[in-house]
Amino acid sequence: MKNINPTQTAAWQALQKHFDEMKDVTIADLFAKDGDRFSKFSATFDDQMLVDYSKNRITEETLAKLQDLAKECDLASAIKSMFSGEKINRTENRAVLHVALRNRSNTPILVDGKDVMPEVNAVLEKMKTFSEAIISGEWKGYTGKAITDVVNIGIGGSDLGPYMVTEALRPYKNHLNMHFVSNVDGTHIAEVLKKVNPETTLFLVASKTFTTQETMTNAHSARDWFLKAAGDEKHVAKHFAALSTNATAVGEFGIDTANMFEFWDWVGGRYSLWSAIGLSIVLSIGFDNFVELLSGAHAMDKHFSTTPAEKNLPVLLALIGIWYNNFFGAETEAILPYDQYMHRFAAYFQQGNMESNGKYVDRNGNVVDYQTGPIIWGEPGTNGQHAFYQLIHQGTKMVPCDFIAPAITHNPLSDHHQKLLSNFFAQTEALAFGKSREVVEQEYRDQGKDPATLDYVVPFKVFEGNRPTNSILLREITPFSLGALIALYEHKIFTQGVILNIFTFDQWGVELGKQLANRILPELKDDKEISSHDSSTNGLINRYKAWRG
C-alpha cells in the first residue's frame, strides 16, 4: 500500500479547479439539464439494494476526476493488499482480514504464509454447536432449567455491532431474550440484572485480552450476582462463556475453556461482529441466519474487490464523501434509516467511521493539511424529522445525508409503511430542490393571505435546496441484505482511508484517556485533597470527593 499525500496529486489540483466551477451549480440545475440523471447516477446490487446518488452536487466530470484521484492514490493495489492478508495495519503490524471471517467461497487467505480459513471455519462450527445446544434447551443451567436470557458483556466493537445487528434482525429472533451491557457505570449492569433469573441466564464475556476494564468490571459484578444465588463456583461454567484469546484468565474466572471462542489479531474490534464476537447474534437469530449475514457481506466483498471503480458502490460513496468533506467543507454526514429496527445503525457506523478515520497524522507520520474522517450521526426517520432536520433543511451547515429504507416491511400494519416511505422519498426531494420564494408567495396569495403578512413571513418559508443526499433502498431487511449493507459502509471507510493516506485500522486516540483514568483511579480511593493535576482537574476531583461524602 503506497503512502501518497492526496493533495499533491494532479487529480486533487484538477478537482480544486473543478470545484471552483461547480460550487454554485445546483442539484436542480443538474436535473434540469439531464432528464436521464437517475439512470446515470444509480446502481443496483444483487437485485437486493438500489443506491441512488443522483441527488448530489456532482457531474460525470466530477466522478471522473474523483476516479483519477483514486487511481493516483493506487486504491486498486490497496484493495488487493487487504484481501491478500498483507499487514496493512502497520502501526500494529497486523493484517486486516474481517473479509476472511465471511469468506463463504472458502478460498485460501494467507497470513504469514498460513491459510487462516481452517481456523475461521473451526470457530464457526464451534459457534454452531454451542448455539444449537442453547437454543434447543439441551444446555441446562445449574438447576436443570434451559437458558432463557443471554447477556452480552462487552464494549466498543464487542457491543455496538452485535447490539445493532440483533436489533436490526429482530424479526428473525427466536425465543431467547437478548441483553447488552457495555458501560462501566454500574447502572447499566444493575438494570439488566433486575430483568433476568440466575438459573436461566447465560453471560457472554467479550474481551480479546480478558483485561478490558469496563468489560471485566461488569463481568465480575455479574459473576458476584450469580454466585449469590448459585453458591458453588463450579456453576459459573454453565452460565458464562468467553469471547477471548486469554485462556489462562478465562479459566481463572471460572469459565470452561471449552466454551471460549477465539478470534485473531487480524480482526479489528469495530469489524468483529463477523467473528466469535457475533455469538450473541447467532444465539438471537440462529446459525443459518448468521451464515446468511456472512453471505451478504461476502457478496459485497466480491463486488468491492472485482468491480471496476467506476461502478463500484463503496468506492463511489467514498469518493463523493471526500468531495464534500475536502472541497465543500462539510464536516458531518448523517445516516438516516427509515426502519425502526435499524435504530442503532448510525451509532454503529459512528464508531466504524470515526474510530477508523478520525486521524490527523498520515501514513508517513506527518500532520495532514486536509480533512480526514467526518463526524457521523443520525437517528431513524421519521423521528429525526421532528428533531434535527430543521438544520439540515435551513441551517448554515452542509450535511450530506444517507437515507436508507426497505421496500418491504416486516410489519405491514395498515398504511404505516406507505406513510413512512412517502416521507423517505419526500425528504430527499425537498433537500435537493427546496422551495423558492416565488412558490411560497403564490401559495400565500392562493390562500388569500394579507400582503403585509406575506412580506414578513415569506423569507422564513423559503427552502434553498441543493442539500446532497444518497438514497439506499433495500428490497427488504434480511440477514443477507443487512450483511451487504454493513460491508458497503466498511469498504467505503477503507477506501477513504486509503485515499486520505491514513491508517484506518488502528485507534491510538482511545489510549491516552484510559492511561490517565488508570492514574486517577487510585487517587479516588480516599478523601485526601488532590493537587497533582492542573487546577481544573484538581478542582473537579476535590469537589467530587466533597460531595460523595
From Swiss-Prot:
It catalyses: alpha-D-glucose 6-phosphate = beta-D-fructose 6-phosphate. GO terms for cellular component: cytosol. Gene3D superfamilies: 1.10.1390.10, Glucose-6-phosphate isomerase like protein, domain 1 (3.40.50.10490). It is found in: Cytoplasm. The active site is at 355 (proton donor), 386, 514. GO terms for molecular function: carbohydrate derivative binding; glucose-6-phosphate isomerase activity; monosaccharide binding. Keywords: Acetylation, Cytoplasm, Gluconeogenesis, Glycolysis, Isomerase. GO terms for biological process: gluconeogenesis; glucose 6-phosphate metabolic process; glycolytic process. The modification N6-acetyllysine is found at residues 80, 228, 234. Pathway: Carbohydrate biosynthesis; gluconeogenesis; Carbohydrate degradation; glycolysis; D-glyceraldehyde 3-phosphate and glycerone phosphate from D-glucose: step 2/4. Its EC number is 5.3.1.9. Belongs to the GPI family. Catalyzes the reversible isomerization of glucose-6-phosphate to fructose-6-phosphate. HAMAP family: G6P_isomerase (MF_00473). This is Glucose-6-phosphate isomerase. It comes from Escherichia fergusonii (strain ATCC 35469 / DSM 13698 / CCUG 18766 / IAM 14443 / JCM 21226 / LMG 7866 / NBRC 102419 / NCTC 12128 / CDC 0568-73).
